[in-house]
Amino acid sequence: MCLAYYTKNYYYWITIELAFGFLFSIVLNKKIDQTYPWLSTNIKKGKLLFKQYPDVMKYTKQLFVHKIATFVLSQTSPFLVFAFSSLKSVAFYSNYTLITDKLSGLINNILGSTGAGVGNLVAEGDEKKIKQVFWELTSIRYFIAGIFIFSLYHLIEPFISLWLGSNYIMDKSILILILANSFIMQTRGTIDQYLYGYGLFNDIWAPLTEAALNLSIAIICGSFWGIEGVLMGPLVSMTLIVCIWKPCFLYNKGFKTSLWSYWLILSKYFLIITSAWILSTLIFKSIITINPASSYKLWILYALITTSIYSIISFILMYIFTQGIRDFSYRMIKKIRR
């Protein structure tokens, strides 16, 4: 990045990225050979192994469809924003998504590391433990997602005002839609991990329908309401497929239990997030008088105060009213004591 910045030649940056990619692959392969000498790959054995494990190709094809649909969902919005507004609006929109996407990626990378553990847990077949860990992971995702959207709702506009200027701030409705989509993307992780753990990829109609709904709704609504209409596409499609269908699919084919308990606990999470949001807003508006858009120091102070107030209230409410966050807390305390 420093080379690209000072030389203004991105070919250098691409060359370095490519070279380090090859170097990393070589070092990684050598480390794998040292750590797992029994794990060897041979292209010549490919056809034989495919015959022995036919499910591998079947699952790969199904997973490929899911990944393509996810790509369509995540990459089409900027083009549609440009189609129904202007290049200037795309730049403004990109400023927001640059912040939300990077933070979402960081959170998902941290929480996504539990995926392999979920697969092992499912393989063990302990139904009670499977459900307990499911709600632990779900509760921590909703807790973190609540902090994420609350913080960005109050902090992203003053930050952009400091960073670029107040004329780069977009309508509040656009911010709400961006955060709603980000919230779904963060909270969907546990369902996806368990679907992968059970090997449930055969609902290939779902990602195709999700992509089709996203494009059609974004195009239709975008022609009427511009950027807000475009953002309605992923919001509606993810609500129908990710929030409604995928839990039904997991509970029916994976857990093989009633879905009513899921909706009941989930409604409790939403009620807690809403209550924590209202209480936090009332508290910090009554005690905070600083303007976060006046300087970076005041913005950092404002961010620490508002985020801390919400985090404390949200954790207390979730700890009191949900079993998942209590189990997760006990697990973390045990690990720390060890």
Question: What does each model-identified segment do?
Answer:
Residues T60, F64, I68-L80, F84, ...:
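Short helix-kink/termination motifs in transmembrane helices of multi-pass secondary transporters
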Residues Y36-T41, Y96, T100-T138, Y142, ...:
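Helix-loop junctions and terminal segments of transmembrane helices
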Residues K131-M185, L215-F224, I273-I278, L282:
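Alpha-helical transmembrane segments of multi-pass membrane transport and lipid-handling proteins
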Residues Y10-W13, L28-S74, G117-Q132, F249-S267:
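Interhelical loop/hinge segments that connect adjacent transmembrane helices in multipass membrane
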Residues T257-S258, T281-R338:
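Membrane-proximal transmembrane or re-entrant/amphipathic helices at the cytosolic face
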